[in-house]
């Protein structure tokens, strides 16, 4: 199975055989977006056009296969940037028509879960934080599985009953995604782009307790109770937090004081990680979820991995974290989900579908 990913600024091509990863080749256009402080859709789309053929050729060479050896093709058809998605979808359709291979249009977010099925892709985060080094892989998911996806475009908690046709959205951000908030706060603090790694690194030098930033949607009117759930019990909001950081910086500057950038970075990060991990664990406990997969680019954040692992362990939940190279956007995760669709007997999507930038997570693959 060959997988193609182009939903944002990474051009990814991955090849799997069943649940065995053969190759995962990624070309990122991140450097082209740095001076703008964020991803520019037009630049990302043009970068995909330039990178696709070399990335495909490199992937086939590393896997030691040809297009004739490929049984089927899977491509991310949403959600994501419309122009970026279009490049990958058009490339996949061209390959499918030229080779006569079946084509599967799959959901980018569910693919982040599918990557957990690849053999030998687990890592352990220390000794006591319940990050599993086993339990996924070999094409079998735990019976009561959830997924916490945290990236620049998405922050969601999912319940996975079947990776191929039964995915439920339990909670999501109602405004900015966590990764987007990191980028915007990094810009406020003058740390550059991408903001996630910069804030994570600087936060180690600061005191997270020096400033108390708000945790969005945690008031009783939003949370409710286990018996009578509030309207946003498992949802997140980061726009107010971003505004609070901006006002904090303005207050220091208005008083003519030096802005404690490291302390603000640490306090901001603690606010984000605190509310993400607490709500995710709450959703898991109240839905009988015993295993949760952490994915998305922000899964690289050291404090998110640490605190989520600690809280999962305290709740008796096993946290699974793929290697960082498979947490971010890549073609291997698309191929992994595509392979599962074939093994489940799901029909291909054909070539008449269109990319869907707002594709709901409940749509695992596009029917013909």
Curated annotation (Swiss-Prot):
Enzyme class per UniProt: transferase
GO MF assignments: iron ion binding; N(6)-L-threonylcarbamoyladenine synthase activity
One Pfam entry name: TsaD
Cofactor(s) of this protein: Fe(2+)
Cofactor note: Binds 1 Fe(2+) ion per subunit.
UniProt-annotated binding residues for substrate: 149-153, 183, 196, 200, 301
Top-level taxonomic group: Bacteria
Primary localization: cytoplasm
Catalysed conversion reaction: L-threonylcarbamoyladenylate + adenosine(37) in tRNA = N(6)-L-threonylcarbamoyladenosine(37) in tRNA + AMP + H(+)
A GO term from the CC aspect: cytoplasm
GO biological process: tRNA threonylcarbamoyladenosine modification
Keywords on record: Acyltransferase, Cytoplasm, Iron, Metal-binding, Transferase, tRNA processing
EC number in record: 2.3.1.234
Binding site for Fe cation: 108, 112, 329
Location of this chain's protein in the cell: Cytoplasm
HAMAP family hit by this protein: TsaD (MF_01445)
Purpose: Required for the formation of a threonylcarbamoyl group on adenosine at position 37 (t(6)A37) in tRNAs that read codons beginning with adenine. Is involved in the transfer of the threonylcarbamoyl moiety of threonylcarbamoyl-AMP (TC-AMP) to the N6 group of A37, together with TsaE and TsaB. TsaD likely plays a direct catalytic role in this reaction.
Similarity section: Belongs to the KAE1 / TsaD family.
Protein's recorded name: tRNA N6-adenosine threonylcarbamoyltransferase
The organism of origin for this protein: Paenarthrobacter aurescens (strain TC1)
Gene name as annotated: tsaD
